[in-house]
Amino acid sequence: TGERMAVVGPNGAGKSTLFKVIAGLMKPDNGKVSVFGAEPSGHICISYLPQHSHVDWHFPVTVSDVVLMGRTGKIGYLRWASAKDREIVKYALNTVGLGSFSGRQISQLSGGQQQRMFIARALAQEADLMLMDEPVTGLDTPSQEELFTVLDSLKSEKVTVMFALHDLKLAASSFDRVMLLNHRLVGIGKPQDVFTKEQLKAAYGDRIQILEADHDIAVVDDTCCGEVEE
């Protein structure tokens, strides 16, 4: 559908676990998972982008190699990539602005470029749903802006994006809907409907203070030396 949903909540709330269950990498303890009306292992194509720290950035592969991995489901494991597959990889890299980086080792990329590479892989995969686990962590403001410019282009590709993050102000300003978690679903819907004092208290508990001014809400975490999430 091209929708963009932010998944927010305190550390340990279950954001990464939720993504792994949706991607079919973990089984739910009970109940079942349905993605666009189908099981994750069904015909729905899901791309999962793990947290930056979970990737071996010194593994000797090029940017093009990683993006081509997105074609594995179409090619199979024992066949060579066709000219069509390589054209799709080229298109995906150009779409995210990495066309001239195809031959570079992944260790040579900046943090923002690494995230754009994974988006290119999802495009090559022809994913219906993209799960991005805290992709803006460690990125400077220009890199974050580049990432969201690329995500804007995915709307025309009809790719739905679920995006785990901690910045509530960014979630409110840059996403169609938000999901607020803390070991359970606290709220889901438009940011202005979910980010209420009551629901933020339910998610973050007594360890935070909630400040309101000019229709903005600031969440101040008393346990993290004044760290602020807006």
Where does each model-flagged region fall?
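ABC ATPase nucleotide-binding domains
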Residues: 196-198, 202-230
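H-loop/switch region of ABC-family ATPase nucleotide-binding domains
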Residues: 165-166
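Conserved ABC transporter NBD signature motif
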Residues: 31-46
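Catalytic Walker B motif of ABC-type/P-loop ATPase nucleotide-binding domains
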Residues: 130-133
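Conserved ABC ATPase signature
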Residues: 105-109, 113
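Conserved ABC ATPase "signature" region
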Residues: 68, 83-101
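Helix-to-loop junction immediately C-terminal to a conserved catalytic motif
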Residues: 23
